[in-house]
Amino acid sequence: SCMKAAPMKEVSIRGQGSLAYPGLRTQGNLETLSGPNDATRGLTSLADTFEHVIEELLDEQQVVQPSKENKDADLYSSRVMLSSQVPLEPPLLFLLEEYKNYLDAANMSMRVRRHSDPARRGELSVCDSISEWVTAAEKKTAVDMSGATVTVLEKVPVPKGQLKQYFYETKCSSKGYAKEGCRGIDKRYWNSQCRTTQSYVRALTMDNKKRVGWRFIRIDTSC
């Protein structure tokens, strides 16, 4: 986030991800998907295909909701993953959440967005950021919602062994405009600064009394 001559918030609370990935519907064949008389145009572009898939998933997400009786639903987060190895891609729920937030903020439909994509217009973000998977071994400790420092457990026991906790963190890039101010802000009239902000996610931790449990902790989530 970029702030102009104003105090900055340290933390914001984000909503938690859905319990399961929404289903994906496939309709029609290649000819019907590309429209009538489009045989000479070939398959649709990868970008349009990706947007179509996300649109389907967002539609499904509005219908598929975790059961109110399922007490484990709040243990899932779009930025936390339990895995035996480092994930190769950003979490799907995170991509859906970020994409939906963008559409909601812009108050526009998917088709309108296709013609106003910043990447297609050559636009740059106000603050440069970097996202990567971080292990509990790298984090070691974190601050919970009560302000106490807790130990982030590296491994989570499961019926067939143990899985590692991974956190998908986003922070300001040291190679960007973090020290020089926000991109596009007139330095003659405004003082600006790119800062990493945090949100709460659910993770398995241990407090100073050796009590292990799932708690909300702060991690870097945006710039």
Swiss-Prot record:
<feature type="disulfide bond">
    <location>
        <begin position="172"/>
        <end position="223"/>
    </location>
</feature>
<dbReference type="GO" id="GO:0021675">
    <property type="term" value="P:nerve development"/>
</dbReference>
<keyword id="KW-0732">Signal</keyword>
<dbReference type="Pfam" id="PF00243">
    <property type="entry name" value="NGF"/>
</dbReference>
<dbReference type="GO" id="GO:0048812">
    <property type="term" value="P:neuron projection morphogenesis"/>
</dbReference>
<dbReference type="GO" id="GO:0005615">
    <property type="term" value="C:extracellular space"/>
</dbReference>
<feature type="glycosylation site" description="N-linked (GlcNAc...) asparagine">
    <location>
        <position position="107"/>
    </location>
</feature>
<dbReference type="GO" id="GO:0030424">
    <property type="term" value="C:axon"/>
</dbReference>
<dbReference type="GO" id="GO:0038180">
    <property type="term" value="P:nerve growth factor signaling pathway"/>
</dbReference>
<protein>
    <recommendedName>
        <fullName>Neurotrophic factor BDNF precursor form</fullName>
    </recommendedName>
</protein>
<dbReference type="InterPro" id="IPR020408">
    <property type="entry name" value="Nerve_growth_factor-like"/>
</dbReference>
<dbReference type="GO" id="GO:0050804">
    <property type="term" value="P:modulation of chemical synaptic transmission"/>
</dbReference>
<feature type="propeptide">
    <location>
        <begin position="6"/>
        <end position="114"/>
    </location>
</feature>
<feature type="disulfide bond">
    <location>
        <begin position="127"/>
        <end position="194"/>
    </location>
</feature>
<dbReference type="InterPro" id="IPR020430">
    <property type="entry name" value="Brain-der_neurotrophic_factor"/>
</dbReference>
<dbReference type="GO" id="GO:0008083">
    <property type="term" value="F:growth factor activity"/>
</dbReference>
<dbReference type="InterPro" id="IPR029034">
    <property type="entry name" value="Cystine-knot_cytokine"/>
</dbReference>
<dbReference type="InterPro" id="IPR002072">
    <property type="entry name" value="Nerve_growth_factor-rel"/>
</dbReference>
<comment type="similarity">
    <text>Belongs to the NGF-beta family.</text>
</comment>
<dbReference type="GO" id="GO:0030425">
    <property type="term" value="C:dendrite"/>
</dbReference>
<dbReference type="GO" id="GO:0043524">
    <property type="term" value="P:negative regulation of neuron apoptotic process"/>
</dbReference>
<comment type="function">
    <text>Promotes the survival of neuronal populations that are all located either in the central nervous system or directly connected to it.</text>
</comment>
<dbReference type="GO" id="GO:0008021">
    <property type="term" value="C:synaptic vesicle"/>
</dbReference>
<keyword id="KW-1015">Disulfide bond</keyword>
<dbReference type="GO" id="GO:0007169">
    <property type="term" value="P:cell surface receptor protein tyrosine kinase signaling pathway"/>
</dbReference>
<dbReference type="GO" id="GO:0005163">
    <property type="term" value="F:nerve growth factor receptor binding"/>
</dbReference>
<keyword id="KW-0964">Secreted</keyword>
<keyword id="KW-0165">Cleavage on pair of basic residues</keyword>
<feature type="signal peptide">
    <location>
        <begin position="1"/>
        <end position="5"/>
    </location>
</feature>
<keyword id="KW-0325">Glycoprotein</keyword>
<keyword id="KW-0339">Growth factor</keyword>
<dbReference type="InterPro" id="IPR019846">
    <property type="entry name" value="Nerve_growth_factor_CS"/>
</dbReference>
